[in-house]
Each structure stands twice: as C-alpha cells, then as structure tokens.
C-alpha cells in the first residue's frame, strides 16, 4: 500500500490515502527508519522499504502492512 511518511512538530506520521487516515508513528524498528517496521498509534505495523538514510521527508513509499505473527518472523 502507498504510504506518505512526513515529519511534523510532534514527530513522524504516516498517511495512508487508500484508507484516508493519518496516524503518528509510535515505534520505529531501525533508527534510520528505512528497511524495518514502524508501528502506528492505531496498532498497524508497516514494513518500510530499504531507502538511504538521508531520504528527505515527506516521501511516498510502497509499504507492506504486517500482522503480529509476520512481524515476529521479520525481527527474529
């Protein structure tokens, strides 16, 4: 799914146009943000693509929504 990641005064957020929702990112697997999963305030886990650390925001990427079992396998 397409997701726009942006930085606001309160931190990072993700906008999902297909669902018309914007949620703050509350947890990041990798400090560089890219190539790992993020957790949104609504509980969604999104697997972000591997991009360069210096990628400027906002940016629209193709992310994958993962369920809890898949997230555990990804991080094991």
Swiss-Prot record:
The keyword Repeat does not apply. The keyword Mitochondrion does not apply. It comes from the Bacteria. One of its GO terms (biological process) is nitrogen fixation. InterPro entries: NifT, NifT/FixU_barrel-like_dom_sf. Keywords: Nitrogen fixation, Plasmid. Transmembrane segments: none annotated. NCBIfam families: nifT_nitrog. To R.leguminosarum Sym plasmid FixU. Also to the N-terminal of R.meliloti MosB protein. This is Protein FixU homolog.
């Amino acid at each position: 799914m397409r997701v726009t990641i942006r930085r606001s005064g309160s931190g990072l957020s993700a906008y999902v146009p297909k669902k018309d929702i914007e949620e703050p990112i509350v947890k990041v697997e990798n400090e560089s943000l890219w190539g790992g999963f993020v957790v949104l305030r609504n509980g969604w886990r999104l697997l972000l693509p591997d991009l360069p650390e210096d990628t400027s925001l906002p940016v629209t990427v193709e992310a994958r929504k993962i369920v809890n079992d898949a997230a555990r396998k990804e991080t094991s």
